[in-house]
Curated annotation (Swiss-Prot):
Taxon lineage: Bacteria, Bacillati, Bacillota, Bacilli, Bacillales
Any one GO BP annotation for this protein: lactate metabolic process
A Pfam cross-reference name: LUD_dom
Protein name, per record: Lactate utilization protein C 1
InterPro entries reported in the protein's UniProt record: FTHF_cligase-like_sf (IPR024185), LUD_dom (IPR003741), LutC (IPR022823), NagB/RpiA_transferase-like (IPR037171)
Amino acid sequence: MMAIQNREEFLLQLSEKLGRKRPEAVEKPKWSFSPQWNVFDGLAQDELVLQLMEHCEVIHTEVKRTTKENLVETLGSLIKEWNIKSAMYSNDERFNEYGLTSCFNNEGTTHFRAWGLGDKEEDIKFAKAADLGITFSDMTLAESGTVVLFNDGLKGRHVSLLPESYIAIVPKSTIVPRLTQATKLIHNQSKAGENLPACVNFVSGPSNSADIEMNLVVGVHGPIRTAYIIVDDQ
């Protein structure tokens, strides 16, 4: 790591030009207003679901709503509709909890592979060629239609990034108003000394890029097609 040269002299000179002593410590400001907490404040969970679904239309993301009992059927219908031949899913206990793992083992013509159970390079190779990646959302932001993924060694980022299409399974209980609640949770985990995810990813629909003339190109940096399956788990 490179040494920082002349830092003290620079900061002292800067403080002098500002007409004050150099601060010895940094104190967090006490904000007079915090409007970010007012967005969707007081909405019931079902109302947040409607806000999420409404914004998904803006970000070109298909939405299905189902129950835990009907999740296998709902996911299976999307897989059939999209003509999925190969799919990778994250190594997440919720796939067992929601009864999906047994479905993957008996899905006929579609080849499923779980991330993190074999060689990592083979996982990446499979993900690159896969038609579909499937993960659960850890938090879901209604305002922006964003799924938040707390990734680690068993829940690799490649699952939601490399395949051609992506499906996020969104338990209704994970839906919060906006980014404010997600960053607050991560901050509290850090403050409490808890282990943080190796990587936190925010996914808002399919990959979108635009040039200076605002010509939209989908799929350059990730999946070209995305769907959220909202599961009534409450």
